[in-house]
Amino acid sequence: MENLLKIYDIKEEELSELKALTPARICVGRAGTRLKTNTFLKFRADHAVAMDAVWSSVDEKLIDTLNFLKVQTLAKDKEEYITRPDLGRKFSEETLDYIKNNCINEPDVQIIAGDGLSATAINANLRKIYFVIVEKLKSRGYKVGTPIFVKYARVATMDKISEELNAKVTIILIGERPGLATGESMSSYMAYESSTKKPESQRTVVSNIHNKGIPSVDAGKEIVRIIDIMMKEKKSGVELRI
């Protein structure tokens, strides 16, 4: 460690400040050619957290408490969801009919939550961010759609739901592929008139939503700010200047 600091002319206090800003492994040092024991054990523990985030399930009580309509993609289980990403983007015709018949049609903003690759992220962040988004949207006079929870969801599920309900802006709050220190990281993908006929570049993203990244409450405020711009400009993704 001392050799690294000398080589790169880094002061100890500067390194401490950098480490305080990120959970990433910075200047962890080595014991000979191997990682130090504490570093190796922390790596194994963080890897286990990431694995748990992928294979865990979203708390059903949380979804029920927030009154989300619950649906599932064509993926039968978690293993198929992981090995067949295409099935996580599709719904059966029965499910699409169920969505259309049980949700508000033509909303200004349609909110979706999906487990994605980290159910842990949804469990940790959904409650706070959802209330912030809904409260601020309604205070601005937007017609907010029936919230929908999608089990075994990929981002593209937002396109099918948007088309079915004819939503102006659709957002999906989804658990992201976990890193070694960010098992609770969630992202919000947003699009104006989201459609399966449009490219992925139609989407605007707010990512890294978790306590050590962008806190849920702050992320919720930023999401609504972006939605305001989308509604005004009638576009999203790479076409939108935010």
Swiss-Prot record:
Top-level EC class: lyase
The molecular function GO annotations come to: cobalamin binding; ethanolamine ammonia-lyase activity
Mind telling me which NCBIfam families this protein's record contains? PRK05465.1
Q: Which reaction is recorded as catalysed by this protein?
A: ethanolamine = acetaldehyde + NH4(+)
Q: What is its EC number?
A: 4.3.1.7
Q: Chief location of this protein?
A: other
Q: Which family does it belong to?
A: Belongs to the EutC family.
Keyword tags? Bacterial microcompartment, Cobalamin, Cobalt, Lyase
What name does this protein carry?
A: Ethanolamine ammonia-lyase small subunit
A GO CC term assigned to this protein in UniProt: ethanolamine degradation polyhedral organelle
**Quaternary state and interactors:** The basic unit is a heterodimer which dimerizes to form tetramers. The heterotetramers trimerize; 6 large subunits form a core ring with 6 small subunits projecting outwards.
Organism equals Clostridium acetobutylicum (strain ATCC 824 / DSM 792 / JCM 1419 / IAM 19013 / LMG 5710 / NBRC 13948 / NRRL B-527 / VKM B-1787 / 2291 / W)
Q: Where does adenosylcob(III)alamin bind?
A: 155, 176
